[in-house]
A protein has these predicted regions:
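Cytosolic regulatory regions built on CNB/CRP/Popeye-like sensor folds
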Residues: 1-159
Length: 159
């Protein structure tokens, strides 16, 4: 998948997909996405591969350009896993560690082959200094994703 294809994955996200946890940035076209994605690095993955290990100390945001991933936590028995969410192209992973600098809180493995775009915190800082309005837009889009995920978790806990 080329950089032009990656841009189209994210630029196609529409505001009416409001219930989904994908990144939605109204007003962002290909030019805005190219400015952000210039600060990322592609990382292909294969089905069943662990792409994020719980406890890993890194501060990178993952943009899902293609594929399907599952987020889960290990149970007290240390063997069984509980699935928390499935994440598809157009969304993000690793946002908690990206924001707070703490170790990864869950495991993430690939359900299907795909590509992640890695955005290290330092690269985002450079982007933010060069494009503060775009960085603000992106942070609000990330906050929307976090809000949807928290709302979904609250709903599951009430059941």
């Amino acid at each position: 998948m080329t950089e032009a294809n990656w841009v189209s994955v994210f630029a196609r996200n529409e505001p009416e997909q409001h219930a989904s946890d994908i990144l939605v940035l109204p007003g962002w076209g290909e030019a805005e996405w190219q400015k952000l994605l210039a600060h990322t690095m592609p990382r292909p993955f294969r089905a069943s591969e662990v792409v994020i290990q719980r406890g890993a100390a890194e501060r990178t945001l993952y943009l899902v350009a293609a594929g399907l991933l599952e987020v889960g936590v290990t149970q007290v028995d240390g063997v069984s896993m509980t699935s928390l969410a499935r994440i598809s192209s157009g969304s993000i992973l690793g946002e908690q560690s990206f924001f707070d600098g703490q170790p990864r809180s869950a495991n993430v493995w690939a359900v299907a082959d795909g590509t992640l775009l890695l955005l290290p915190y330092d690269n985002f800082t450079v982007f933010g200094e060069a494009e503060p309005a775009l960085a603000r837009d992106f942070l609000f889009a990330m906050a929307r994703v976090l809000s949807i995920r928290l709302r979904n978790t609250s709903f599951r806990l009430r059941r």
